[in-house]
């Protein structure tokens, strides 16, 4: 999975990304040449100063590169993040709605189908990992801050490395935010 986010270098800079479109394209090509036959590219809509035209261009450029999978996420501003503290010029709700609709239209024209809210794939290339979340397949996270779903229990491991490093062998000692799923 390669995180392009946008094909507009100005948008990338506003996001704090350290790559340009040309560098992303080079990385994508290097992945292909290394033998990766199933690539995902992440894109983001609703970015600062982004408009429908630049979003459509991003979709068309990336779809034209023919990755097997495209994740098209909408930017969500979270409290406590640098973006939340800035006054940003973001697309309004109507423009974001049009971006979402155009995502489906453009990617469908390139042979992708939508199988989740934000995910599009070529036939047979849907991400099994993503589908597992929707079908409640069990998964185990290992390491600091990792998430798991196991035996109808959802939980997160400690985020503090010093405490996690003192693990005593009892899994319960490092699990937090436990939630039992009943439906």
Segments predicted by a language model, with ranges:
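C-terminal scaffold of the Radical SAM
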Residues: 1-183
